[in-house]
Swiss-Prot record:
Subunit text: The Tat system comprises two distinct complexes: a TatABC complex, containing multiple copies of TatA, TatB and TatC subunits, and a separate TatA complex, containing only TatA subunits. Substrates initially bind to the TatABC complex, which probably triggers association of the separate TatA complex to form the active translocon.
Subcellular location: Cell inner membrane
Keyword presence, Isomerase: no
Similarity comment text for this entry: Belongs to the TatA/E family.
PANTHER family for this protein: SEC-INDEPENDENT PROTEIN TRANSLOCASE PROTEIN TATA (PTHR42982:SF1)
Alphabetized UniProt keyword annotations: Cell inner membrane, Cell membrane, Membrane, Protein transport, Translocation, Transmembrane, Transmembrane helix, Transport
Pfam families: TatA_B_E
GO CC annotations, alphabetized: TAT protein transport complex
Protein name: Sec-independent protein translocase protein TatA
One GO MF term attached to the UniProt entry: protein transmembrane transporter activity
Organism annotation: Rickettsia rickettsii (strain Sheila Smith)
Segments crossing the lipid bilayer: 1-21
Length: 53
């Protein structure tokens, strides 16, 4: 059971209320940087395992 569009809107509204309009761009920027770092880390992790075999 996945998230529907209405569930996504509710979550975004809650985030908007918690962080406010001023901090929201900074929060989204930090989230995007964190996701990119995670993906890069996963990519690096797979190549290290291949070298050790």
């Amino acid at each position: 059971m996945g998230m529907s569009f209405s569930h996504l809107l509710i979550v975004l509204l809650i985030i908007f209320v918690l962080f406010g309009a001023g901090k929201l761009p900074q929060v989204m920027s930090d989230l995007a940087k964190g996701l990119k770092a995670f993906k890069d880390g996963m990519k690096d992790d797979g190549s290290d395992n291949d070298k050790n075999k």
